[in-house]
């Protein structure tokens, strides 16, 4: 049975727009027979890396900080598949996920080697060389807003000796929840997220067609802007009235 470790770094946890895509994806993974553990960074104490390199030169493979990374380290080491879920925050991942990623340094050795023509750190023997999948949501309309996050995850995989298997990306994500509540036709997006979970376990990959459906245009740009800006103006007007 494949072991899947999912990290949802949205501060809104299960009520987030990110969870709208993550949850059916994880359901599909479970339905395909894999074991899934889900953690919310909002519920974890993960301190920033202090850059002391104690985990490299004093106590190899062990971080000196006493926080919730202690319970995550063995899970990160043993996971066949890592699923990192994050909304786009200022063109990147959330701060809480960045803290977690920075604290993964004990999983690699300080020695530098050249792999595929580039300097890398080798993983420790106990660390499984598995896959990584990104799930992300953003408030801007265009799909290219995810480019920096995808690039970051691909670089992370190269450094951590994991295979980047793909990304479930949901642009103009707030529209998905609104349209769902209004009964508008968005079920295909959720079904595609679920299907992506099945494909990941059954085929060790996700089809481009499935990922395109997850990211498809929900409504025209101008209509999206009108709706979002109307909500913000109403909120600001309410402050003025008070």
Predicted feature residues:
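A short acidic, helix-capping loop that chelates divalent metal ions and anchors anionic groups
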Residues: 174-179
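Short, histidine-centered active-site or binding-site loop motifs used for metal coordination
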Residues: 8-11, 136-139, 172
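N-terminal beta1-alpha1-beta2 submodule of the flavodoxin-like/Rossmannoid cofactor-binding fold
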Residues: 1-112, 158, 165, 187-242
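Short, glycine-/small-residue-rich phosphate/pyrophosphate-handling segment
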Residues: 95-96, 109-163
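Beta-strand-loop-alpha "switch" segments that mediate conformational coupling across diverse proteins
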Residues: 166-171
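Short glycine/threonine-rich loop-to-helix capping motif typified by GTGT followed
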Residues: 180-185
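Histidine (H) residue identity feature
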Residues: 59, 118-121, 152, 172, ...
